[in-house]
Design a protein with these regions (language model features):
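Glycine-aromatic micro-motifs
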Residues: 1-115
Length: 115
């Protein structure tokens, strides 16, 4: 069964790593409650905190989900050393609440610019 995933940075259409989504089915623009941080050349999403972050939702298969997890550093032996974890959250996809996977930033807000 396919999974739904919300992407908000380098995986979005036209971004530097959008090629990773070539085997995914684009479902449309979406937004999630959260704050986007400038980490380096890539962003990090902290869920909640009152703002809205725009992104896109894709339908993907298990193999692509595994590849994206590797790209985002998920599944490390000690995930506390990673930057992200993958969580299920509700986004608004074309205005409708939809449960999706999201990569959330784990390292906090301090020292990072809000974008």
């Amino acid at each position: 069964m396919p999974d739904l995933i919300f992407v908000y940075g380098a995986l979005r259409k036209g971004a530097s790593n959008d090629w990773r989504m070539k085997d995914a089915r684009w479902l449309g623009p979406a937004k999630v409650e959260g704050t986007l941080l400038k980490i380096d050349w890539y962003p990090g999403l902290v869920l909640g905190l009152g703002g809205w972050v725009k992104g896109e939702v894709y339908e993907i298969g298990a193999e692509l989900l595994k590849e994206l997890d590797e790209f985002e550093g998920i599944g490390l032996e000690d995930e506390r050393n990673g930057e992200y974890h993958r969580v299920k959250r509700e986004v608004l996809l074309d205005g409708s609440p939809t449960e999706v996977w999201i990569y959330e930033w784990l390292k906090g807000l301090e020292g990072f610019e809000v974008v």
